[in-house]
Design a protein with these regions (language model features):
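Acceptor/aglycone-binding surface of glycosyltransferases and processive sugar-polymer synthases
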Residues: 53, 60-82, 87, 96-179, ...
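Hydrophobic helical membrane-anchoring modules
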Residues: 175-314
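Cell-envelope/extracellular polymer assembly enzymes that use nucleotide-activated donors
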Residues: 2-4, 35
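Acidic helix N-cap motif at the loop->helix transition within catalytic regions
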Residues: 14-18, 45-54
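Short, well-formed alpha-helical segments that are part of the catalytic scaffolds
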Residues: 12-27
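A conserved acidic beta->alpha catalytic loop
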Residues: 40-49, 95-96
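Short beta-strand/loop segment that forms part of the nucleotide-sugar
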Residues: 20, 32-42, 64-65
């Protein structure tokens, strides 16, 4: 299989037929073997019923139905886990991103890149969405240095090796380019056409921005020590232990010089607390190291209710 397209679906019943018609037309023009994996993320409308009809009409379609709404990251992860293509494409189901841009992104990938991120330009959303997205992207660029204008664009093309090295949860789907870039993959972007939403309602809200920023802080904090937790915890613990020891040394010196009783002084209690906390952090680092060594892969964080696939796609 050359190409796997993963499409997360949540209450998009009105756009699915047109989406697949336009997507399949553009994929056929490429001349490679492809599959489309629709992941119904607990839709409340008739999305799954429409997907079943599409599945029956084309053998290149696979449908996964999650038991409830797990969120976009887990929907994508379910699709990635079932994708067989050497190249992975992600595309939202709302038709705001144009399927006609897929061949152009693949051309960019052939220039030697590992991931090509879409850049919705000009963006056809309301000003609040555009404003929050602009702020979000500026913050990501300022702290990470990744020169992308639209990191959260749902239209992405990347090599399979990327999904084999990153783990998605929470709101981390928006950081796929950053996670790949931090691991040494070549990442670029290309402007893509963007259309106003014609069907359904937008899933964007300000709480997603906040959750996304919190996930970014988590990534930035732990990424440097993911494979060696002792670097983060042990160094911090050692610093705290030395600080506590320094306070004890200072108080002991005052006792020797001025005969001051220190055992019940608040500063002495604080020093002992710091030393104990430092030791605990050091051992936490060692424990984290052990967990990394014995854990080969994370447990699946989503639950599949139904899977539809044709025998030749197994």
């Amino acid at each position: 299989m050359d190409i796997s397209v993963v499409v997360p679906v949540y209450n998009e019943e009105d756009s699915l037929n047109e989406l697949f018609e336009r997507l399949s037309k553009n994929l056929d023009s490429i001349g490679k073997k492809w599959e489309v994996i629709f992941v119904d993320d607990g839709s409340k409308d008739n999305s799954f019923e429409i997907l079943m009809k599409l599945f029956q009409s084309d053998k290149r379609i696979k449908v996964i139905k999650l038991r409830k709404n797990f969120g976009k990251s887990y929907a994508l992860k379910a699709g990635f886990d079932n994708a067989r293509g050497k190249i992975i494409i992600t595309l939202d189901a709302d038709l705001q991103d144009d399927p006609a841009e897929v061949p152009h992104l693949l051309e960019e990938l052939d220039k030697g890149y590992d991931l090509v991120n879409g850049w919705k330009y000009p963006r056809k959303d309301n000003w609040i969405t555009v404003f929050f997205s602009w702020i979000f992207n500026k913050i990501i660029y300022f702290f990470s240095g990744l020169p992308l204008h639209d990191i959260n664009c749902g239209l992405k093309v990347f090599r399979r090796s990327i999904i084999e090295e990153i783990v998605l949860y929470g709101e981390l789907h928006r950081f796929i380019p950053l996670l790949a870039w931090r691991r040494g993959f070549k990442v670029t972007e290309r402007k893509v056409k963007h259309h106003p939403r014609q069907f359904g309602t937008s899933k964007f809200n300000w709480t997603k921005v906040i959750r996304g920023l919190l996930d970014f802080i988590t990534i930035s904090f732990f990424l440097g020590s993911t494979y060696c937790p002792s670097h983060l915890f042990s160094i911090t613990g050692l610093f705290i232990f030395i600080l506590g020891g320094g306070i004890v040394g200072y108080l002991e010196l005052r006792k020797i010089l001025f005969n001051i009783y220190i055992a019940e002084r608040p500063l002495f209690i604080l020093a002992v607390f710091l030393m104990i906390a430092g030791i605990q952090l050091v051992f936490t680092g060692f424990l984290g190291e052990l967990i990394v060594l014995v854990t080969e892969s994370p447990a699946r964080d989503y639950s599949i209710e139904k899977e539809l696939y044709h025998h030749e796609n197994t």
